[in-house]
Amino acid sequence: MSVPQPRLTLSDQPSQVRHVVIISEDGMRPDLIYGQQNMVWHEQLYRNGSFSWKARTIRTASTLPSHASMLSGVDVDQHGLTWNTWLKTRGFIRVPTIFQAAEENGLKTAAFVGKPKLRHIMPAGTVGIFARPGYYCKKVSDEAARYIEREKPELLFVHFSDPDEAGHSDGWMTASYRKAALASDACLGTIYRALQQANMIDETLVIVSADHGGHARGHTGAIPSDREIPWIASGPGVRRGYHIRSAVSTMDTAATALAALGLAPLTRISGRPVSEIFQSSTRTGL
């Protein structure tokens, strides 16, 4: 059994946060977000929130290991997911995730994903709902939006596959990749509108990030464009239009989500809350 750890603290953590939504855009490069027109929902979030274009994923810059680190707060040597495909015989993540911490505190959790291999991170019994409505983000976001409006979860993870699929098919930063990024932007809007419709937006910390970037038709992790990822946070108490100064790791996503909800990790983690995103006026003493 995991030994509960002390609560991670955000010195400026806002008491208004009641929900956290993490949206991962598979293979999304940060320079695509700030360097392309019509990324309207991304722009709305980073102009009204805090952001880093130099956040980093783990050295194993691929979907399954990276998402495991994003949602557990530890590196691959601890979580054990070294492969990158659905292999039921290999088993599941060997450390607790943020969903288990939330579930143990009576919070409602859910995950809507485009790739079945992410089940290795969230086996049955560790997350309230695990759903794969389809591969592309339109089906994923539509189903997640309906769930948001109906259930109002405290912790939600949504995964979009579109940028990664286009990158592998035609190349990162190609016309088709840019088109896929625009589709992902529209799906981000679907989630945001659902939060508004459910009257959750004023109590929700939204974190938008990615598992890895890419170049040519792959992402080995050997160069910056593979490991650099966007990291955007928007919500109550978050600094507006603020460029994060400190280094941000994908493992910090887990830590920030837990701290924002006032939860302790179920085991020791490497990630740390990105506390500078919060305004000093919302200090709660955590």
Residues covered by each model-derived region:
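Active-site His/acidic residue clusters
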Residues: P116-V127, A145-A186, T190
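Short, structured active-site-proximal loop/turn typified by the sulfatase FGly-forming signature C/S-X-P-X-R
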Residues: D31-S66
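Metal-dependent active-site segment of extracytoplasmic phospho-/sulfohydrolases and closely related
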Residues: V21-I22, W41, A183-P224, W231, ...
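Structural recognition of the beta-strand scaffold that forms the well-ordered cores
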Residues: V20-S24, D31, S52-K54, S69-L71, ...
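Polar, surface-exposed loop/tail segments
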Residues: L263-L286
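Substrate-binding rim/cap in mid-to-C-terminal beta-strand-loop elements of soluble/periplasmic
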Residues: L71, A222-A264, S275
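Catalytic-site neighborhoods of secreted/periplasmic enzymes
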Residues: D77-V140
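Solvent-exposed loop/turn segments at secondary-structure junctions
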Residues: D26-P30, F51-S52, I58-S62, D75-D77, ...
